[in-house]
């Protein structure tokens, strides 16, 4: 009984730690010029919660320690590749096909709570093909060579 009381007290107290409670979605500045609506839909479904400024924060994003993990993952995802800040250099855009092929993205721990992000083999291949067409074979380009960039319409 004593352990339960201390455990409950600890669970309540960690909610007071401020990290992970401020969930922001900065403005969308630009997206890539997607080769098709299907590519955009697949990337939205499987990638946008961590790799965009359009994160859908689930209810458990407000409960520590899950809030800490989610905040860390979204911050890391956005810093590595952000599909909604395409006006800035995205040095990891060239890695999309490799990460999806290896099964590293979307990560295994994301899928149980986000079943829509689970892609079939055909969908993975369509995402890879569409991303290669949309982002180019080199992935990210220098800002001066980003002719395929389009502003986001609201």
Q: How would you describe each model-predicted region?
A:
Residues 3-154:
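Aromatic- and Gly/Pro-enriched helix-to-coil junctions and flexible linker segments
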């Amino acid at each position: 009984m004593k352990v339960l009381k201390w455990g409950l007290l600890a669970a309540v107290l960690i909610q007071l730690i401020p990290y992970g409670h401020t969930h922001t979605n900065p403005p969308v500045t630009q997206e890539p010029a997607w080769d098709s609506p299907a590519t955009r839909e697949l990337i939205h479904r499987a990638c946008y919660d961590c790799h965009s400024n359009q994160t859908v924060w689930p209810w458990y994003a407000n409960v520590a320690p899950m809030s800490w993990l989610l905040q860390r993952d979204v911050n890391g995802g956005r810093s590595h590749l952000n599909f909604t800040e395409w006006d800035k250099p995205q040095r990891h855009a060239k890695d999309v096909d490799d990460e999806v092929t290896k099964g590293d993205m979307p990560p295994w721990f994301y899928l149980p709570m986000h079943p829509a992000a689970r892609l079939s083999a055909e969908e993975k291949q369509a995402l890879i093909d569409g991303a290669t067409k949309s982002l180019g074979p080199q992935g990210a380009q220098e800002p001066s060579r980003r002719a395929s960039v389009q502003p986001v319409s609201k």
